Amino acid sequence: MLKLFSAFRKNKIWDFNGGIHPPEMKTQSNGTPLRQVPLAQRFVIPLKQHIGAEGELCVSVGDKVLRGQPLTRGRGKMLPVHAPTSGTVTAIAPHSTAHPSALAELSVIIDADGEDCWIPRDGWDDYRSRSREELIERIHQFGVAGLGGAGFPTGVKLQGGGDKIETLIINAAECEPYITADDRLMQDCAAQVVEGIRILAHILQPREILIGIEDNKPQAISMLRAVLADSHDITLRVIPTKYPSGGAKQLTYILTGKQVPHGGRSSDIGVLMQNVGTAYAVKRAVIDGEPITERVVTLTGEAIARPGNVWARLGTPVRHLLNDAGFCPSADQMVIMGGPLMGFTLPWLDVPVVKITNCLLAPSANELGEPQEEQSCIRCSACADACPADLLPQQLYWFSKGQQHDKATTHNIADCIECGACAWVCPSNIPLVQYFRQEKAEIAAIRQEEKRAAEAKARFEARQARLEREKAARLERHKSAAVQPAAKDKDAIAAALARVKEKQAQATQPIVIKAGERPDNSAIIAAREARKAQARAKQAELQQTNDAATVADPRKTAVEAAIARAKARKLEQQQANAEPEEQVDPRKAAVEAAIARAKARKLEQQQANAEPEQQVDPRKAAVEAAIARAKARKLEQQQANAEPEEQVDPRKAAVEAAIARAKARKLEQQQANAEPEEQVDPRKAAVEAAIARAKARKLEQQQANAEPEEQIDPRKAAVAAAIARVQAKKAAQQKVVNED
């Protein structure tokens, strides 16, 4: 009982939702054996006959080629194409190809020489001793692609399967009306097809191998069973005729009961599917050493006198095949490449045969009926009932017309297999498949644009990151290459630092400055030299950084230099021609001189006779004495050279002169006799003394260079001097009396 249940489970057939049963129309072409077609005079071989990018050209115009010679190189997913016959390459130019849009694609045009010479062929009869990688590479380089209609490179598909394939399915359903290419191939070449299946099984090592074939092909079923009579590793499954049972997802579910997930592939559930024609091409590539240069094409339709299946060379113009079959076109004759449900109408008959061409249908006007006008959707849901992918064609139709791409994507328009079942049952004659094809093309274009935008953004961000890295590296180089202080500057800095440390260590020792001795300014000078060295190093580093960051403009530099020279000349001119705007008032000068002399005498007298109550700061005393002497000399000089406009009171002048002399003597006495109570900084003392000497020299210079503007009256001067002497003597006597 368990064995019976297992056998029933093993041979069980599942059924998918939807599907239709259109007229088969297969008897027109499946009754005659395969035949060869005479060679055409010219062949057009498009470089791209598969899903993916076109290969790289390896021939040039004027080259002689042999049948099977590669015309392109296959790298990665790029599949090569081969010469269908021997001849000469006459052109490499765009040419219309087998596509609904009939767009021109780059093609190699070969003029046949009629000899049909092959390249040297190297078959692998011992393919079982070859590695998996070697077999896949040979299949790929010999140009084998899916011949069921998709055109996916077989080598890439086998490589992607890897070790996760448990079930290998051979699609022999061929469910679309009129097409009998696979049926006739299995009838005439069943042994070769099975041998190709064994090569695929050797590569994939699946757990089971299934051949799915519809029950409307009794002769092909008989031939396969005869070949598989002694085989137990390959199982032939006969399934009911239903369109589109030949779809990859539909046949997978029929044979295994497994459903391919939305947006996924059959390999995701451990299943890999190949077409009958692909298995035959694999056998010829591996065992016979022949690249794919021809395939079986069905020529059918009431407009063809001799329908049947022929071996058509790739690149043969459609017109040549139809004429050989007795094509009798009507006034508005159409030719369909493919079947009536999934095929497309050719715009002209110069289109070449490619790897995915399985049928050329030339129906009469009565065969397909008059074209019906498209009407509005009545929402009958017949399309949803017929859809084998469980989609909602009515909703997808509205989304496609309204260009609502997001909603169309959400409703899984990508899962549409474009079988045409929905359009077949539509009572409003709406060409739903055309809308879906256009919508998928627009979505693909949008995604391609988004991909390019993302790549451009990634390139921009990478460029920004590279610029940031280069900037950081450049700044690091500038920092490391900055000019260091010269050797002598380093020595000066080190010496200054050593002296500073020594001074700090000796800070507790008192510093005594003796009168008349010159202070030691070596530490100050060394520190100043060190600061200058540091400034020079810093300036050099700044200059180098500025030079590295910005290159100076020579014109701007020249202009600035010219402006500087002009300013210098202007200043020299002003200094040479300038005259003092204000004159010194002689009366005020005489008064100030008299006052200064009086203050000096008074200070001298007080200093000579009095004992200081407080200690005097020698630094301040020296500075004040120098300032007083300078002022006295300046006033005397001004008084000698200037003529006062008004008379000066001689008594006041004598008093002021005496006071000035007294102050001066007092300051000198205090400086000579006083001992400082506090320690004096020698550096500050030296600086103050230098300032006082500089001011005194400046005043002497001004007094020596001054020119009197007016003459002084000698009589008045004599009177003033006499009065001053009298007053001075009187003051001295009075002072002596006071002391006694």
UniProtKB/Swiss-Prot annotation:
**Region Disordered, annotated ranges:** 602-714
What residue ranges carry the coiled-coil annotation? none
Give the binding site residues for [4Fe-4S] cluster 2.
C387, C416, C419, C422
Report what the protein is called: Ion-translocating oxidoreductase complex subunit C
Q: What is the gene name?
A: rsxC
The reply on keyword ATP-binding is no
GO CC annotations, alphabetized: plasma membrane
One biological process term in Gene Ontology: electron transport chain
The cofactor(s) it depends on are: [4Fe-4S] cluster
Q: Which cysteines are joined by disulfide bonds?
A: none
Using the record's annotation, list all stretches that form the 4Fe-4S ferredoxin-type domain: 369-397, 407-436
> Which residue stretches does the UniProt record annotate as biased composition, category Low complexity?
605-615
Family that this chain belongs to: Belongs to the 4Fe4S bacterial-type ferredoxin family. RnfC subfamily.
**Any GO MF annotation of the entry:** 4 iron, 4 sulfur cluster binding
Enzyme Commission number(s): 7.-.-.-
Task: Tell me the residue numbers annotated for binding [4Fe-4S] cluster 1.
Answer: C377, C380, C383, C426
Q: Which residues form the signal peptide?
A: none
Q: List the PROSITE patterns.
A: 4FE4S_FER_1 (PS00198), 4FE4S_FER_2 (PS51379)
Instruction: List the subcellular locations.
Output: Cell inner membrane
Species of origin reads Escherichia coli O17:K52:H18 (strain UMN026 / ExPEC)
What's the stated role of this polypeptide? Part of a membrane-bound complex that couples electron transfer with translocation of ions across the membrane. Required to maintain the reduced state of SoxR.
Organism domain of life:
Bacteria
The annotation note on the cofactor reads: Binds 2 [4Fe-4S] clusters per subunit.
- Main localisation: membrane
Assembly notes: The complex is composed of six subunits: RsxA, RsxB, RsxC, RsxD, RsxE and RsxG.
